[in-house]
Regions:
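A nucleotide- and high-energy phosphate-metabolite-utilizing enzyme signature
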Residues: 2-337
Length: 337
């Protein structure tokens, strides 16, 4: 349960996000700008959050404009959300402790794109609150209510689109068994805050479930979903308005490789495919580079549109190309560059 899974072929083993100076800078900003105290009003805390998010977003846009990679920028935004949720969680625990002598073990996991550490400027945030057994009764309901009020409400009030689920470990695995989309999202699960033992218990049981729950059937089902998705998006890379996320050769195709690898071999990452001779080292590096470039295109789309956009529409292409550093005067040459 290192903060970031070693997905990328070019990443050194078990790289910690804190090793990047940009991510350390974000954490320093949080220490200065986020000071949630019980004496503060809800409005004052909300203003702190809004100002913190505004300043960090402006900083990310500057890094993007100077040419930072798509992957580094999406990881940086994930760190921003991490530190915000960690601060909100600490405050929520203070509120809980006023009414409960002993806080029951629970944790918050990032799932989906947030779990991978790949949040573009306007990407949705997916969270899973893992709670102890429901036999806690009223104490559990109080704990859940406090976490919703002190964590989710502030995120929603600042305009973030946050998806969430509150589950026990067994419930989470049952949901993964019912729906492949839930399973894929949980394959990217990452610890954010709370009791690490609860998180480790979930990861251990979930990966054990994935390895025992007919892996071949999962691969077939995922391949079927991929074919359907590609058909909906034109089933070709030669489109005037490509979908960088769901189109053929888009972000979702790469992510599917990681999910399949994790289920088949028990661990994700292109390194496993290289060691198993499914890919050459050069092919793995090329995939990584292409993926990071698509993330950079998506980041530019989000910054320019000020909303989550994945389709590179024809009228947007000249300005997106310019924002990515392609400065040819002829707009057709610029787009094709």
């Amino acid at each position: 349960l290192a903060p970031w899974s070693n997905y990328r072929y070019q990443s050194s083993p078990r790289v910690q996000m804190e090793d990047d100076p940009l991510f350390r800078r974000i954490r320093q900003h949080a220490e200065l700008r986020l000071d949630f105290r019980a004496t503060q009003s809800t409005k004052a805390r909300l203003e702190q959050i809004k100002e913190f998010m505004r300043l960090e977003k402006e900083m990310l846009q500057r890094y993007h404009q100077k040419g930072d990679s798509g992957l580094r920028l999406t990881r940086a935004r994930s760190v921003i959300v991490d530190v915000l949720i960690q601060n909100l969680f600490d405050y929520a625990l203070e509120v809980v402790s006023e009414s409960m002598e002993r806080t029951k073990p629970m944790c918050i996991l990032a799932t989906g794109g947030y779990g991978r550490g790949e949040l573009s400027p306007h990407s949705d945030i997916d969270l899973m609150f893992l709670y102890p057994h429901s036999s806690m009764g009223k104490s559990l309901e109080f704990l859940k209510g406090t976490m919703t009020r002190e964590i989710l409400y502030p995120l929603w009030d600042t305009g973030m689109k946050v998806g969430h689920a509150s589950r026990e470990v067994k419930e989470a695995i049952n949901e993964a068994q019912k729906d492949i989309r839930n399973k894929n999202s949980m394959l990217d699960a990452r610890y954010v805050c709370g009791d690490r033992k609860v998180a480790k218990k979930f990861v251990s049981r979930f990966l054990g479930f994935c390895r025992s729950d007919q892996p071949a059937k999962y691969l077939d089902e995922l391949h079927g979903h991929q074919e359907e998705r590609r058909a909906e998006k034109g089933d070709t890379v030669f489109l005037q308005a490509p979908d960088v996320k769901n189109g053929v050769g888009g972000l979702r195709d790469y992510q599917g490789i990681l999910w399949m690898t994790k289920v088949k071999f028990g661990e994700g990452g292109l390194k496993k495919l290289v060691s198993r001779k499914y890919l050459s080292e050069q092919e793995a590096r090329s995939l990584d580079d292409a993926y990071s470039f698509l993330l950079r295109v998506r980041n530019e789309l989000h910054f320019r549109s000020k909303r989550p956009v994945d389709v590179l529409h024809l009228e947007k292409q000249p300005e997106v190309a310019l924002g990515l550093g392609y400065e040819e005067e002829d707009i057709f040459r610029r787009v094709e560059a």
